[in-house]
Regions:
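Extended, composition-driven regions rather than compact fold-specific motifs
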Residues: 2-280
Length: 280
């Protein structure tokens, strides 16, 4: 049966307040790190673990937080501006990219970041040649958007670039919660093992070499999912146009409440360095 989220037409003010996300601000600090290890998760996903004393005090409270990655120059030198200076060099700013922290180990002072490697760009180029000892700069996160786990369930929709955030969210969800995940990857080789204490359903959508960013494949998959029950939080992260289409369909066709439906553009066809929240 088509996906129909069983949400109240007009949630009470009390319910909306109980489900309201929190925001946290963080001090912006430029951190110098080096690569500790590189792990090939799938043909198109690398996990790079960073280390360094500058990671002390790192904080990321939201599952879809993002940090800015600052890349070395063509000589492999990471030229971070000294504390107190105003801004970054233009070339470094243009090459910055947003990535979700996968996991942070405060005791070991290590930070893992997953890289979906597809089209050429500064992040993909750096990740593909990364090796132990290579330098990388980290800035942020500037803030965290903390979504309660107290919903009856969570619907998480995305593509390869969204997998790190989806993985984080699944780690956070408690037993007794429903989690429905719909992820588009190229083929079965790019599927990852997803774990959660929640009652988890995972639906993989394969594009089989077709260009990424087509909303129709995920829209078709949603129509095949059995209806969940209870109040659901909906989270979408995709190519910009596709994310807008998915959010609109969830609200207009599947009964999702706008306040419980967050969509983000993790990339945009024809553009570089895009990361934006979609409000409508």
């Amino acid at each position: 049966m088509p996906l129909q989220l069983s949400l109240p037409t007009s949630p009470s003010p009390e319910l909306l307040a109980a489900r309201a996300p929190e925001r946290a601000r963080h001090e912006i600090k430029l951190r110098r790190t080096t690569v500790e290890s590189v792990e090939q998760l799938t043909p198109h996903m690398l996990r790079i673990r960073l280390q360094g004393a500058d990671l002390a005090g790192f904080s990321s409270l939201g599952f879809d937080d993002h940090v800015k990655l600052l890349f070395p120059d063509s000589n492999g030198e990471l030229q971070l501006p000294p504390p107190g200076s105003e801004g970054l060099p233009p070339a470094m700013r243009e090459a910055m990219r947003d990535y979700t922290p996968h996991s942070y180990d405060a005791q070991a002072q290590t930070l893992a970041i997953d890289f979906a490697v597809h089209e050429a760009g500064p992040a993909t180029a750096w990740a593909l040649q990364a090796a132990a000892g290579h330098a990388l700069g980290i800035a942020g996160p500037r803030g965290s958007f903390i979504v309660p786990t107290a919903f009856d369930g969570h619907l998480l929709i995305g593509d390869d670039a969204a997998l790190p955030a989806i993985t984080r969210r699944l780690r956070e969800l408690p037993a007794g919660t429903q989690a429905v995940v719909v992820v588009e990857v190229n083929d079965a080789a790019d599927e990852q093992k997803l774990d959660s204490a929640a009652d988890l359903q995972v639906h993989w959508v394969h594009r089989q070499g077709q260009p990424a960013g087509d909303a129709q494949r995920l829209l078709a998959a949603l129509r095949q999912i059995d209806a969940p029950a209870g109040d659901y939080y909906n989270w979408v992260a995709l190519e910009s146009t596709a994310a807008k289409a998915l959010r609109a369909a969830l609200i207009a066709e599947h009964g999702a409440h706008p306040k419980w439906t967050k969509a983000a553009a993790y990339w945009k066809r024809g553009s570089s360095g895009v990361h934006e929240v979609i409000e409508e």
